[in-house]
Amino acid sequence: MLFSLRRLKKLANLEAFSDQKVIDSLINLGFEVDQITKLNEISGIKFGQILEIRKNPEADNLWICKVQFADKIREIQTAAKNVIENKQVLAFIPGSKSGNTTFLAKKLRGHISEGMLISAVELGFNKHLLNSELDQGVLVFDPIFDLESNPLKVLELDDLILDIKLLWNRPDGNSYLVLANELAAFFKTDFSLINKEISGKFYSELKIINKTDSKIFALEIQKLPKLALVDIFLLLKSEVKIGNLAQNFSNFILIYTGQPSYCLQLEKHQQKVELIEQKVKIKYEPDTISSYHFLNQEKKPLLIPEFSDQIIMENNSFFLIMPKFNLLKVKQIKQFLKKNSLKLTQLGKNYNYGTTFIALSFLNFFLEDQKIDFSWPINFDKSLISKKTFLDLNYNELKEILGLELSQEDISKTNLILEKIGYNFDNTSFSPPFYRVDIEFFADYAADFLRFYGLEKLKDCKLEQVKSKIPNPDLEPVKLKTLGYYETNSFLLISKEEDFNPLELKSQDLLTFPSQEHTKIRYSLAWQLAKITKYNQKRKITEINLYEKGSIAGWNHSLALASTIYTSEDLKKHLKILYNYDFDFLPADSEFLNPEKSQFIYLDNVLVGWLGQVAEKYNYENVNFLEILLSKVEKIPKKEGGKIKFRPYDNSQLKYRDITLSLPMKDIPDPYLKVIQKIPEIFSVKLINYVIINNQQKITYRITGPDQVCAEIDKFYK
């Protein structure tokens, strides 16, 4: 978003500080100042008041304006047809500059012109953003300015425009008030959004019947405010197109507070508005899309946000509608319209009720200043922002995260600054600012703490000297590639409806998320591999071996395998190749898994994974999975093996015995195999046959080894 540095400094009471210092502080606060642009290169311009207008008799399209300035009366010629007597103008007078051009008195068609009247374009504004009133000639306005005053200061024209890139999880930052609040806290000046109140002069009788999943708040206002010229210029600096009074007012609220809004007017007998979703069609477009419609009591549309605005009568009361629409619906509308307006972009962000509260408290101040009456908020109550989430404080963890030695005084001073932007602290916990959606974990608080403690202080932190150690090479990717697996990468986030969670991990619904398909942290990597496998099967790829290693819910690190080629027994062997642990496999009792083909994996009686196939309801037949929680496995120490002993070479031929296990359908062979595998010097145990007879599993294994192995097996059977 584009911000006026002059307005930010004015709001935050930073006129005593240099432009560069304020810009540097924004960067230190973590805001990316992508570009700095000077609005114009003009100097020496003056306010003037037109006393008289007459035509230049020697020119077809020139008018001679007698203009009163603070020091004298001057005659200035212009071709603009919108000049009016007794109105004020801006003018370059002799000695004024625009870039490398210095203005002088000059003779035009037989008459001296002592300067030039100024248009909006000559002030540095984009011609395509001007409405017809601003673009019809020179700037003409009511005589409200002191002719002695400096237009560059009064109209904030000596300005730098900052292109500030905000993180996607800081929608509140698209607001002059929020940025000014953080600057004031940083510089310790007198400005705060906190502890503001909302009120009203009367109670509105409007009832909003909301038949959608969106939230709608409103304010009844007795008269449409007209923005001051300096605020119109502020909209232009933000690259907002100037429209009618209602559009300008709504856009001004947007850039000041971050709250999108629409103006709605009702006839006097109307006291009810209905919000529905309904198909809408654009002229010359074949497709339709479902969008929001505000209907009157006769079910006729009054307002279709982003499709058609209502014409607002200037001196009649109206309603300022402040929505929080469904984010997915906004995204669809944005794609359909191929439109990227500031309002539509903000509607697609996950701002919270705190942003609405900031808008309401600002409107209280703004409308009172304009002497316009307004109602108490409709549908909004301060309790919406008073429900606070508290997180535990741990200052030792804070020091560890930041890598800084912090004194109690450092912590107390910085927390006092953080209170100015809305933090609340007690001895053991804190709550984040009411308008922030990005503070979910203690580490988020630590990041804010560092912003206001001072990033530059990280320079004083000396790195400790540590002894270097060459790490052991990670052979897992090599082993997996050798076994025929291909690596995949999937989204960390899944939709709220996806509940595949065989290991019963705890996830967390995020307050901010990129889309409705990605709202919480995944429970299982195997689930992601299942979706990738099905996608490839649709592409007629039948032989699939995939693996992924990554994070899942509960701060766990996981490895998952998926195969349409290997059996579950093969996957067990691969697990042994990857991690030389003595795993136990027990029948899996889970609604998410196929009970006849799945097992839980244990290590030292700790559940560390699962193996087999997912439940039939998911329709992933003939795909075998293995998922292991590496974060749990790594916490369990490996049992040290005994000393290696060498024996004389035995060149006798290996022999084998075939044994068959007869097991119930839900039983697994692993406990029985463990007994057999305790026989010393077994060379191999191989599955050679598996059949089901009379609802019994008949599983045949071939055990290969020297004579003493076969003797032990024979003795075991006897």
Swiss-Prot record:
<feature type="domain" description="B5">
    <location>
        <begin position="386"/>
        <end position="460"/>
    </location>
</feature>
<keyword id="KW-0648">Protein biosynthesis</keyword>
<protein>
    <recommendedName>
        <fullName>Phenylalanine--tRNA ligase beta subunit</fullName>
        <ecNumber>6.1.1.20</ecNumber>
    </recommendedName>
</protein>
<dbReference type="GO" id="GO:0000049">
    <property type="term" value="F:tRNA binding"/>
</dbReference>
<dbReference type="InterPro" id="IPR033714">
    <property type="entry name" value="tRNA_bind_bactPheRS"/>
</dbReference>
<keyword id="KW-0067">ATP-binding</keyword>
<dbReference type="GO" id="GO:0000287">
    <property type="term" value="F:magnesium ion binding"/>
</dbReference>
<feature type="binding site">
    <location>
        <position position="448"/>
    </location>
    <ligand>
        <name>Mg(2+)</name>
    </ligand>
</feature>
<comment type="similarity">
    <text>Belongs to the phenylalanyl-tRNA synthetase beta subunit family. Type 1 subfamily.</text>
</comment>
<dbReference type="InterPro" id="IPR045864">
    <property type="entry name" value="aa-tRNA-synth_II/BPL/LPL"/>
</dbReference>
<keyword id="KW-0963">Cytoplasm</keyword>
<dbReference type="InterPro" id="IPR009061">
    <property type="entry name" value="DNA-bd_dom_put_sf"/>
</dbReference>
<feature type="binding site">
    <location>
        <position position="438"/>
    </location>
    <ligand>
        <name>Mg(2+)</name>
    </ligand>
</feature>
<dbReference type="InterPro" id="IPR004532">
    <property type="entry name" value="Phe-tRNA-ligase_IIc_bsu_bact"/>
</dbReference>
<dbReference type="InterPro" id="IPR002547">
    <property type="entry name" value="tRNA-bd_dom"/>
</dbReference>
<feature type="domain" description="tRNA-binding">
    <location>
        <begin position="39"/>
        <end position="153"/>
    </location>
</feature>
<keyword id="KW-0547">Nucleotide-binding</keyword>
<dbReference type="InterPro" id="IPR041616">
    <property type="entry name" value="PheRS_beta_core"/>
</dbReference>
<dbReference type="GO" id="GO:0005737">
    <property type="term" value="C:cytoplasm"/>
</dbReference>
<dbReference type="GO" id="GO:0004826">
    <property type="term" value="F:phenylalanine-tRNA ligase activity"/>
</dbReference>
<dbReference type="Pfam" id="PF17759">
    <property type="entry name" value="tRNA_synthFbeta"/>
</dbReference>
<keyword id="KW-0436">Ligase</keyword>
<dbReference type="Pfam" id="PF03484">
    <property type="entry name" value="B5"/>
</dbReference>
<keyword id="KW-0460">Magnesium</keyword>
<keyword id="KW-0030">Aminoacyl-tRNA synthetase</keyword>
<dbReference type="GO" id="GO:0006432">
    <property type="term" value="P:phenylalanyl-tRNA aminoacylation"/>
</dbReference>
<comment type="subunit">
    <text>Tetramer of two alpha and two beta subunits.</text>
</comment>
<keyword id="KW-0820">tRNA-binding</keyword>
<dbReference type="GO" id="GO:0005524">
    <property type="term" value="F:ATP binding"/>
</dbReference>
<keyword id="KW-0479">Metal-binding</keyword>
<dbReference type="InterPro" id="IPR012340">
    <property type="entry name" value="NA-bd_OB-fold"/>
</dbReference>
<keyword id="KW-0694">RNA-binding</keyword>
<feature type="binding site">
    <location>
        <position position="444"/>
    </location>
    <ligand>
        <name>Mg(2+)</name>
    </ligand>
</feature>
<dbReference type="Pfam" id="PF01588">
    <property type="entry name" value="tRNA_bind"/>
</dbReference>
<dbReference type="InterPro" id="IPR005147">
    <property type="entry name" value="tRNA_synthase_B5-dom"/>
</dbReference>
